[in-house]
Amino acid sequence: VGYGAAWLLDGMDADSRLVSVELEADLQRIARATFDDDPRVEWVLGDGSEWLREAVARPERFDVVFADTWPGKYHDRDLAMELVKPHGWFVLDDLYPQPGWPDGHQANVDRLIADMQSIDGWRTEFLPWGSGLMLCVRD
């Protein structure tokens, strides 16, 4: 819990902001124990899909959107991608097989990768690091 936030915060400057959306209060509590004193972090407790629907209605757009869970990656991806500024990044992880994946999930991952590589207005690159990353850059 919090590895993604640690990675992102390490590369951010003092004027940047990280919005962390977490559905489970216990998981957010663990992450907050580590990062709560960092003024760059905004904590949102709630459903990722609901947050995405609310966020696209606001004018703010982001330099980087890191889709680390089902909302924004396997559903409501169009909403998450809409939040990315021109020339910004949309980052997907966990694209290599993982222990505990439900049966048939590899087909979801394969479809996701193929879909991302065919979207107009985006350049994509698969990065064979860690759990398997895809970097998508908006034109």
Please identify what each model-predicted range represents.
Residues 1-139:
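S-adenosylmethionine/decaboxylated-SAM
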